[in-house]
Regions:
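A general structural signal for well-ordered alpha-helical segments in protein cores
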Residues: 24, 39-40, 52, 56, ...
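Conserved phosphate-coupling serine/threonine residues in phosphotransfer and NTP-handling enzymes
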Residues: 16, 94-96
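Compact structured core domains
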Residues: 88-89, 95
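Active-site neighborhood of HAD-like aspartate-dependent phosphohydrolases
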Residues: 1-43, 48-51
């Protein structure tokens, strides 16, 4: 399948649908962890309950700050509007907590059919969330597409048997080889779906 032919579109949230201006280096600094530490994976190894709660509180505050600062990525709102017009199902799969996710979605008016956070499905790169969405839509994973900006997103798609699309930014071009598709701007994908509509019509 080519871009514009997939029967459902699933998005990562931060760095994909929205720019939350998240600085994970700063988060690691706040936590006192080495730069580049995988946040949720390292948190799961913390055995001391007091330290776990301290770290979790810092992470949750960080996510809420991101939700309050988030803005639509260029072209994302127009793409979602077109997909809804064409009755193509849409979803969000994010590693964020539920309260921060919904604060962001409600503040920006982002509407999709399914939203799964790390409290609703195992966190990426576990493919369970993508498979849950595919099952809810009763569509084969191979006929859907997952769009994200990080290697976790691409690994999650691959594990689910779903095409993975890298949403490019200034720092993630080295993930190109892990992606089935690469997208520089949401207007490009919107055009693909517009052309599909004309062909079908």
């Amino acid at each position: 399948m080519q871009l514009g032919e997939h029967r459902g579109v699933i998005f990562d949230l931060d760095g994909t649908l929205v720019d939350s201006q998240l600085d994970f280096g700063l988060l690691c600094q706040r936590l006192g962890w080495p730069a580049g530490t995988p946040i949720l994976e390292h948190l799961a190894t913390v055995r001391d309950q007091r330290e776990y709660q301290r770290a979790l509180g810092i992470i949750e505050q960080f996510e809420l700050e991101g939700a309050a600062a988030a803005q639509w990525m260029p072209g994302a709102a127009d793409l979602l509007a077109l997909l809804q017009q064409q009755q193509i199902p849409t979803a969000i799969l994010t590693r964020n907590m539920r309260s921060a996710t919904w604060h962001c979605l409600e503040r920006l008016g982002i509407a999709v059919d399914i939203v799964l956070t790390r409290e609703d499905a195992p966190a990426k790169p576990d493919p369970a969330g993508l498979l849950q969405i595919a099952s809810a839509w009763q569509l084969p994973p191979a006929e859907l597409i997952f769009i994200g900006d990080f290697h976790f997103d691409l690994a999650t798609a691959r594990a689910a048997g779903m095409p993975g699309c890298l949403y490019l930014n200034d720092q993630n071009g080295h993930y190109r080889t892990q992606a089935d598709f690469v997208l520089a701007h949401f207007a490009d994908l919107r055009l693909c779906y517009q052309q599909r509509l004309h062909l079908v019509g």
